[in-house]
Amino acid sequence: MDPHPCRASRPPRAEEPGQREAEHPGHRPTFGTKAHFGFMKHEVGKEPDPREATQLALPKIFHQNSHMFRQDSDSFMFHVAVKYGCVGKQGWRASDVDFDDDGVTVTGRSGAPGAEPEAFRAQYVVDASGFRSPLAEKFDLRDRPARFKHHSRSMFTHYVGVKRFDDVSGHPKELRPPADWHTGTMHHLIERGWFWIIPFDNHKDSRNPLCSVGLTMDERTYPKPKDLTPEQEFALFLDKYPAVKRQFDGASKVREWVSTDRLQYSSKQTIGDRWCLMSHAAGFLDPLFSRGLSNTLEVVDALTSRLLEAFKDGDYSAERFEYVERLEQGLLQYNDEIVNSSFIAFSHFRLWNAVFRVWGSFITPGTMRLTRARLKHFKDKDQRHFRELEQNDHPGLWWPQSDKFKILLETTSETCEKYEAGALTGDEAADIIFKLLDDSPIVNPVFGWKDEEKRFIYPSVATMGRFLYWASVQAPPEMNSVGREFLLGIVKAGSKVRKLL
């Protein structure tokens, strides 16, 4: 993969009114289905207790969620960009970026043998590379060390033949979750780490036999060995957790392992005159909770709306893009709070059960907030509905206009850190967070987030109806308007609502 895919930007060709949208990639036969986020706690040398598991199943109306097979989804988006006028330069490495009063010069060359250097002029540069960002290196933008509290390293590959956890767990039916583990993203939790099992073959229409497999763990607890290959180290971890190991009986890897050092990196600055470090070029935290594409697309939305205006008046100053900076840094900061809390809590189930609810309880209103803007835009085509999303005090928080949620998240983080430091027991920390959830008027009581015994959250259509009533009528004002307008938008969208959701 090209480590320096720095791209010069120019305005895309506008889509003609009435033009058909490109094929939606969400139902491709190489993608898996993502019906839930599933979590099972494991201890060294023991069988997992089925009572120490949590699951957030997605409402059926949202079941177009996918385990995206990235080589296909990325190819899809690349060809959409080419369709709209982007000039593709595959295997092209940027070696230098120079700025002047009139624009930017990006210099590099193709990876083909004997290729000559090339230079491209642009008005603005979006560096969407990653850890080895050319702009971060040029302007010395990296924090050293990364400013995040969270620590982890990772190893990952693709397998064939990974068994369904439902088939190897040995758990009785009455203690299993309502959605099969195999139908979603499986997180096997260990002390300060987690395995992921992400199948692409978990529905009848799949034509992809692969399964994404990985292990992410705190590198301070598990220093990276110098005398083992990643495959050998992974095998040693499997030997510690018998139920996870059974999933790999007879399975085979189909690509080489990738093994990282510490994953976390951050930047002092992500926006400047005529440039942007976008998403993974700006920083990275951890794959837990699958925030990568979501964060990227939030930044794309905020950045492109401003770029289109800049192309009209020629103002590419950092001041114009100041909100993008706050959004990028906020996305990383708030993710650090919840992921660090989660890693601390993995070894104590009650504490994890509490942190799980802080994370999960605001996914639905966060999604509703975005969908409400789409529904309103669908009705009148007014772009202001998207601009209004940015009118909040906490960019990057997944419910960004809620002071109450920010306080809940930060208090959860502080409580977990006290447990980590030995100032609280795990049960004391869990009690504090459960009381915060129970006392909070903005935490949805309908799904079961306030009920410690309800470990599997599986909202039916009827439950969604009760939730929308609560959100529209009984919830605090910051939720009421979203609930009412979301419900009204669904009614007005009629048969097209599923596409908009």
What would you call each of these model-derived segments?
Residues 405-501:
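C-terminal non-catalytic accessory extensions
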Residues 1-43:
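N-terminal FAD cofactor-binding segment of flavoenzymes
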Residues 347-448:
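Long, charge-rich C-terminal accessory regions
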Residues 285-304:
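A conserved FAD-binding loop/helix module that cradles the flavin
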Residues 256-278, 283-287:
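FAD-binding beta-loop-beta segment adjacent to the flavin cofactor pocket
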Residues 75, 79-243, 300:
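Predominantly flavin-linked oxidoreductase catalytic cores and closely associated redox partners
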Residues 301-356, 370, 374:
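Active-site-proximal substrate-binding core of FAD-dependent oxidoreductases
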Residues 46-70, 105, 216-220:
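Helix-loop-beta segment of a Rossmann-like dinucleotide-binding subdomain
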